[in-house]
């Protein structure tokens, strides 16, 4: 039906007869001469038709988004009529034949216009997908999936599918449940991850497994979250952290070659505690400096009770400083006020600072500091004339969080971030357990191997866990797993999953661990998030063919939707009014 895609045609084809197919992107009638911009997956090419052409009458019928097949001769555009914005901007096709394969209603959205209301774009997603930019996103997505399969297959991994209808298990989010028609009152759960099945594959001697897995989590959505998503999932037997990290680094190196990036290995590694203390995040963006600096001891003799009391409890509280070089000339009073309002959103009670002037130091903290304390702060933060040093004080978790966010906010405000840089990082030595209102729970998941389970302070127990971070975004992570029944039971006890509950929820896993489970570990990389970063897309919804909204609904199909009484009866379900 066609000889070329639109953007395959160039000056070398001048004089040739070509056949192209696609949609009418724009239609113009200039004094009897008709111009049509034809669009296909590759981009645009201009068709031109004057009254002398036998295709002219048909060309007059064309409107936006009509489906066309066009045949004609390639020629150079006239002098001064070239379009440098188009790949085909130097040529045009003089129409000889034109077929209207299908007409179109007036489109409710402009194809390729990202400023159109997103709900409208999602409702008419099949139109939104027609833009060449969308095609390039899904072309890359397909290429990355193929690279993943080829790379892991070369390393001896087998692609194995795990069940979608599974058992509900606690993994940090709510499960999507599927009622069983056959087993009245019982439910399947859609998998939040293939975690337990891939561990069972290792028990089964599969040695190295992977799949590009569909996962489901019923959780509150954010810009980078979806209720159903895809991850590159893998597991290895007889391995340690270094082995797993090596596979991930090799895989990411091959993947990023697809977009012309050469990334070096090994990636930098940073302990979790260092990441939190120095950057206020377990996924720090290292494309710029601005470290957080501990200055608690400088406030021990401060006359400000809030700061001095905080300084006396270094286990649970923190005083962090952030020196922003040259900020005094760049940050007006209104900007400082905006930054204070920003950190208040995350639990700060205010934002103290010191402005380093030529002949004095200004700021609300100056009068509360001793001469020695002030001197130590200036030395430790390397504060020079023109700098502003910001301070956060209070509960450790809250301070690290809002000061880490302030660090990012300042970097964005001052344009300190190299948008083209790729800064990969491993964050390691995560805490095994986290405190909640109801005791402790597993920070990653309860199948992670702890490093020092006998430690008296449960909050100091570390996990054989690791996250891979790119430019401040968690790409994925993994861990070495527990492969002995006794250790698995011990971890369950630490998080108040006692024997009876453990058997009910995880009896099949505990049983499997009795039969010679090998040491094993693995990883998962968020596939959608990876493609979002590689394409510099604004939202994860841009890289999923038919995404859900932030309210977990599909505007295209109106899912979820009610079901009729007969279906409910078959499933033994009665709805409460």
Swiss-Prot record:
**What are the boundaries of the region Aspartate?**
195-198
Q: What does this protein do?
A: Aspartyl-tRNA synthetase with relaxed tRNA specificity since it is able to aspartylate not only its cognate tRNA(Asp) but also tRNA(Asn). Is 1.7 times more efficient at aminoacylating tRNA(Asp) over tRNA(Asn). Reaction proceeds in two steps: L-aspartate is first activated by ATP to form Asp-AMP and then transferred to the acceptor end of tRNA(Asp/Asn).
Q: Which organism is it from?
A: Helicobacter pylori (strain ATCC 700392 / 26695)
Q: Any idea which UniProt keywords this protein has?
A: Aminoacyl-tRNA synthetase, ATP-binding, Cytoplasm, Ligase, Nucleotide-binding, Protein biosynthesis
Its gene is aspS
Recorded family membership: Belongs to the class-II aminoacyl-tRNA synthetase family. Type 1 subfamily.
Query: EC number(s) per UniProt?
Result: 6.1.1.23
The name on file for this protein is Aspartate--tRNA(Asp/Asn) ligase
InterPro entries, alphabetically?
Aa-tRNA-synt_II, aa-tRNA-synth_II, aa-tRNA-synth_II/BPL/LPL, Asp-tRNA-ligase_1, Asp-tRNA-ligase_1_N, Asp/Asn-tRNA-synth_IIb, AspRS_core, GAD-like_sf
């Amino acid at each position: 039906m066609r000889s070329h895609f639109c953007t395959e045609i160039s000056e070398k084809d001048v004089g040739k007869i070509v056949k192209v197919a696609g949609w009418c992107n724009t239609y113009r009638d200039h004094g009897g001469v008709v111009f049509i911009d034809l669009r296909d997956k590759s981009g645009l090419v201009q068709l031109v038709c004057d009254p002398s052409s036998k295709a002219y009458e048909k060309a007059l019928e064309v409107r936006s988004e009509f489906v066309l097949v066009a045949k004609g001769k390639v020629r150079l555009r006239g002098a001064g009529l070239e379009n440098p914005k188009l790949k085909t901007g130097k040529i045009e096709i003089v129409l000889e034949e034109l077929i209207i394969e299908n007409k179109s209603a007036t489109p409710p959205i402009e194809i390729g216009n990202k400023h159109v209301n997103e709900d409208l774009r999602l409702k008419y997603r099949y139109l939104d997908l027609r833009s060449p930019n969308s095609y390039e996103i899904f072309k890359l997505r397909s290429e990355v999936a193929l690279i993943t399969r080829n790379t892991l297959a070369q390393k001896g991994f087998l692609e194995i599918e795990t069940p979608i209808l599974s058992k509900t298990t606690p993994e940090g989010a709510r499960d999507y449940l599927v009622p069983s028609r056959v087993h009245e009152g019982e439910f399947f759960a859609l998998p939040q991850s293939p975690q337990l099945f891939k561990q069972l594959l290792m028990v089964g001697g599969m040695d190295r497994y992977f799949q590009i897995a569909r996962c489901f989590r019923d959780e509150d959505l954010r810009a980078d979250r979806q209720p159903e998503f895809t991850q590159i999932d893998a597991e290895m037997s007889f391995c340690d952290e270094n082995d797993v990290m090596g596979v991930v680094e090799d895989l990411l190196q091959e993947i990023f070659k697809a977009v012309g990036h050469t990334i070096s290995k090994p990636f930098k590694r940073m302990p979790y505690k260092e990441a939190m203390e120095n950057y206020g995040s377990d996924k720090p963006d290292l494309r710029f400096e601005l470290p957080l600096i501990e200055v608690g001891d400088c406030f021990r003799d401060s006359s400000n009770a809030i700061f001095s009391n905080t300084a006396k409890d270094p286990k649970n509280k923190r005083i962090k400083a952030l020196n922003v070089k040259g900020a005094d000339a760049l940050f007006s009073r209104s900007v400082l006020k905006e930054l204070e309002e920003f950190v208040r959103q995350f639990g700060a009670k205010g934002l103290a600072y010191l402005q380093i002037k030529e002949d004095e130091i200004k700021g609300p903290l100056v009068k509360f500091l001793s001469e020695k304390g002030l001197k130590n702060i200036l030395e430790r933060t390397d504060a020079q004339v023109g700098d502003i040093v910001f301070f956060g004080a209070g509960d450790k978790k809250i301070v690290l969080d809002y000061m880490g966010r302030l660090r990012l906010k300042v970097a964005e405000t001052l344009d300190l971030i190299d948008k083209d840089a790729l800064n990969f990082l491993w964050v390691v030595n995560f805490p095994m357990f986290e405190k909640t209102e109801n005791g402790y729970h597993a920070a990653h998941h309860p199948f992670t191997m702890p490093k020092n389970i006998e430690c008296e302070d449960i909050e100091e127990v570390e996990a054989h866990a690791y996250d891979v971070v790119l430019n401040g975004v968690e790409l994925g992570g993994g861990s070495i797993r527990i492969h002995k029944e006794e250790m698995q039971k011990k971890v369950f006890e630490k998080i108040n999953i006692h024997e009876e509950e453990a058997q009910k929820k995880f009896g099949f896993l505990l049983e499997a661990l009795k039969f010679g489970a090998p040491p094993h570990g693995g990883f998962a990389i968020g596939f959608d998030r990876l493609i979002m970063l590689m394409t510099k897309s604004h939202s994860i919804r841009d890289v999923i063919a038919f995404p859900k909204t932030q309210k977990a609904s599909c505007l295209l199909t109106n899912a979820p939707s009610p079901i009729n009484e007969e279906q409910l009866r078959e499933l033994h379900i009665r709805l409460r009014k």
